[in-house]
Amino acid sequence: MLYHLAMALEGVYSGFNVFQYLTFRTILGVLTALGIALLVGPAVIQRLVEHQIGQQVRDDGPQSHLSKAGTPTMGGALILVAIAVATLLWSDLTNRYVWVVLLTTLAFGVIGGVDDYRKLALGNSKGLSARAKFFWQTVVALMAAVFLFSTAQSPLETSLIVPLFKDVVLPLGLLFIPLVWLVVVGSSNAVNLTDGLDGLAILPSVLVAGGLAVFAYATGHAVFADYLGIPFVAGAGEVVVFCGALIGAGLGFLWFNTYPAQVFMGDVGALALGAALGILAVVVRQELVLLIMGGVFVVETLSVMLQVASYKLTGRRIFRMAPLHHHFELKGWPEPRVIVRFWIITVVLVLVGLAMLKVR
């Protein structure tokens, strides 16, 4: 909104030209979302406490988690508001990628919000049924996929890019649609599974968003894309502002979510953040790189899948408890140690992913 106002006033005062620069607007997006989260956060937490919107804790989990019962949850709504406001203020709202990324994120937030509400209303940790949750996730993801497929302006926008190999592009055709579904739904649920410790999911989400922001900037810049040997996708660079908003909102939320957490994001935040990372990777055509940068989310998900498969096939469990972070807790690792080590791993994986920009 303010971007369009500044462009309209460009002829009145030349200083408004600065708003045409993507980097400047991204910085504003970071600061705006961060400011909203930090300023509004205490009031949101207080309101959640007053309405007794507290976390329900499983009694079969680590005993140390029982003390978390009653901690305010659904704080992810704060993240979504901060992201939405910052994105709407500083993005080019005529850009289709901005809208598909923002609306997909918010839609998954609504799904997560309904899930959180049912948990609170029913007084247990079950929430929305897995079938219902999966159905609505599929509906939203397919809508985004069909939109991107139908508005694609070149075959590159619906092709799979293989990292490390220059000019290796696999045209997908209609297979692009199920790929988008898999990436968005998979990423959403992976982040949700990871969100089991204080700050464990939010900082890796911020770090991966930062990595994808670099890819988005390069992908949307014809000169950089040509130099780096990656596909040029016109308009994709504009989602960097959204990435900045996510980073700012995430850091602001981490201020209150760091151990010991004053508030949890709930499914309203976790499902939305995962979907955001997934749809961002699709827009910049780096779905395979997302697997690397989001390796912590991938491993957490695989630990659950392996645990379930092993128990059903052999009656034995591979891990003491899944997802993987609970396994380390039950081994005696203090919660902060698990969290920080997962953060460190994510930093390394994001750097590896960024290195693939040049290694071709």
UniProtKB/Swiss-Prot annotation:
Question: What's the short name of a Pfam family annotated to this entry?
Answer: MraY_sig1
| Keywords, alphabetical | Cell cycle, Cell division, Cell inner membrane, Cell membrane, Cell shape, Cell wall biogenesis/degradation, Magnesium, Membrane, Metal-binding, Peptidoglycan synthesis, Transferase, Transmembrane, Transmembrane helix
Q: Which InterPro entries does the record associate with it? A: Glycosyl_transferase_4, PNAcMuramoyl-5peptid_Trfase, PNAcMuramoyl-5peptid_Trfase_CS
Q: What superkingdom heads the lineage?
A: Bacteria
Q: What is its EC number?
A: 2.7.8.13
Q: Name one GO cellular component term.
A: plasma membrane
Keyword Transmembrane tagged: yes
Q: Name one GO biological process term.
A: cell division
Kindly give the membrane topology term recorded for this protein: Multi-pass membrane protein
Q: Of which family is this protein a member?
A: Belongs to the glycosyltransferase 4 family. MraY subfamily.
What function is annotated for this protein?
Answer: Catalyzes the initial step of the lipid cycle reactions in the biosynthesis of the cell wall peptidoglycan: transfers peptidoglycan precursor phospho-MurNAc-pentapeptide from UDP-MurNAc-pentapeptide onto the lipid carrier undecaprenyl phosphate, yielding undecaprenyl-pyrophosphoryl-MurNAc-pentapeptide, known as lipid I.
Protein name stated in the entry: Phospho-N-acetylmuramoyl-pentapeptide-transferase
Q: What is the lineage of its organism?
A: Bacteria, Pseudomonadati, Pseudomonadota, Gammaproteobacteria, Chromatiales
Q: Which gene encodes it?
A: mraY
